[in-house]
Amino acid sequence: MGARWPVLPTVLTALAVPAMVGLGVWQLQRAAWKESVLVRLAANAAAPVLVLGEAPIPRDAAFRQVVLWLDCPPVPPTPSGARLASGQAGFGWRLSCRAGNGSFVSVTLGASASPLDASAARALGEEASARSIWRGMLVERSNGAPGWLLVSRDALGPLAPAKAPGLESIPNNHRGYAIQWFAFAGTLAAIYAAWLARWRRARTG
């Protein structure tokens, strides 16, 4: 005589469906948190220029226009992917500089449509080392790297101003993820209910 109830499928479904619903609720909570962050960053972007000088950079300074003092080494900057202020794709040129409190700030000196030769890159580094006052937008570095990125408002040498990241560059897909988890839970529950109905018919048929 077979089992009166399909224990294993029932237990697995009873564990999986609440877990998926819980993940959906968690994503909704993350969405609310991300939306509050975006509101704060939008306020930062619209705020007046923050003159820091040699003071430490506040932790909530992302997307603020700032003026700060930096000590940059006379070395060639490194290239990175960037866009010119016009929107054209090109090369960004970054240099790691030291702020007044000893922390490091990666500075985007500007952007170019094509690579720079070695002599032009050396000249950029020398020009950057001669400057102490920097103006631009602060953003958090990508890929979880520590420290800040300053997108300089005033391009150096032959460079054009680089396009600073906008709020649209910050993903906010949590509500979509929540819908997916709720859909997974509903689909699994429906599949289990249909399978259970067939299982019962097979036992009574």
Per-range role (PLM):
Residues 1-205:
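Surface-exposed, charge/polar-rich loops and edge strands
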